[in-house]
Regions:
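Disulfide-bonded cysteine-rich modules in secreted/extracellular proteins
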Residues: 208-228, 257-273, 299-304
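Hydrophobic anchor at the start of a short beta-strand
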Residues: 58, 126-128, 150, 290
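Repeat-associated, polar segments at repeat-unit boundaries in modular proteins
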Residues: 239-259, 286-304
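Aromatic-lined carbohydrate-recognition surfaces of secreted/lumenal glycan-active proteins
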Residues: 124-138
């Protein structure tokens, strides 16, 4: 669990270095509201710039007044225009809390959520939903709420929303944090959104290029060639690179056994181990598997 806040122009000028020093890890910033880019939050740019400079992870939210799914799409486009060119480590949230929207019922609320979030998703954003527990329970279908990262508001000592897993809980609107004059909304975060977003290539981030994984056989050959060190160092290197050490070492042992058998088989062909029962006895006494060696000898002889 990590600590976060959400801010808008209502908080005025924020000293994010003091906010960061107080133990806050992330901030969700209001980007704007409504269907026009002219409705951008007056403090959005300075909040974004200063929060980033202080080393905070940042998300954004867009307050909705949408009265139709089409209107929600317009809001999404306005939101994307405002936030374009920026990187966010937390989702871009659709803020659903207008009474006029809830008055239109669950089907309506579902439609505007899907319209807004769907438009953002089409354009490479991880879109989420902000809503209170009461309205989530009564005006949003579980299958819709479950599709998006949830930011749940409930000012209580615990969050009672249980229909779906939520990533953030807004637990108070009367918090006090160094660097902010007056009250501020307080949040607990439960999901590692920065990793999800960066690895997924969302919210302005490019998806990292992952090196092609080598097969166990390829790795085993490299181990035999001495490219992965020995003992614990080998185990550590293979594990750190994301490989299964036990599987690789098993294949190494198989390859070494095969190489050993090949060497002995060539010596047998050269007459160094005698013939018939004498050969069998010598190989067995030396600790070799006579049947495996002889099978390899037979195969090599056929190939000549």
């Amino acid at each position: 669990m990590i600590k976060g806040i959400d801010v808008s122009s209502w908080q005025g000028v924020v000293d994010y270095r003091k906010v960061k020093a107080s133990g806050v890890d992330f901030v969700i910033i209001r980007a704007g509201f409504g269907r026009e880019t002219s409705q951008k939050d007056n403090c959005f740019e300075q909040n974004y710039k200063n929060a980033k400079a202080a080393g905070l992870d940042v998300g954004a939210y867009w307050y909705s007044y949408a009265d139709s799914a089409e209107d929600a799409v317009r809001e999404a486009k306005a939101c994307m225009e405002v936030i374009k060119g920026k990187k966010f480590e937390y989702p871009i949230y659709f803020d659903l809390e207008e009474q006029s929207q809830f008055a239109k019922g669950k089907a309506f609320c579902d439609s505007v959520i899907k319209a807004f979030c769907g438009e953002l998703e089409k354009n490479g954003y991880l879109a989420g939903l902000y809503c209170s527990t009461y309205y989530l329970n009564n005006f949003v279908s579980n299958n819709v709420a479950g599709k998006y990262p949830l930011w749940v508001a409930q000012y209580n000592y615990r969050c009672t929303y249980t229909a779906d897993k939520y990533g953030i809980w807004q637990y108070s609107d009367e918090g006090r944090v160094n660097g902010i004059s007056g009250n501020v909304d307080m949040n607990y975060g439960y999901t590692d959104y920065p990793t999800i977003i960066k690895n997924g290539g969302y919210n302005g981030y490019k998806k990292p290029v992952t090196a092609e994984k080598k097969t166990v056989t390829q790795l085993a050959k490299e181990v035999v060639e001495g490219k992965w060190s020995n003992g614990d160092e080998r185990r550590q290197k293979l594990t750190a690179a994301g490989y299964n050490y036990s599987a690789v070492q098993k294949k190494v042992n198989e390859l070494c056994e095969k190489m050993k058998i090949d060497k002995i088989a060539h010596e047998v062909i050269q007459g160094k181990w005698g013939n018939g029962e004498e050969r069998q006895q010598k190989l067995t006494n030396a600790g070799y598997d006579y049947d495996k060696v002889q099978a390899r000898v037979n195969k090599l002889m056929k190939e000549q």
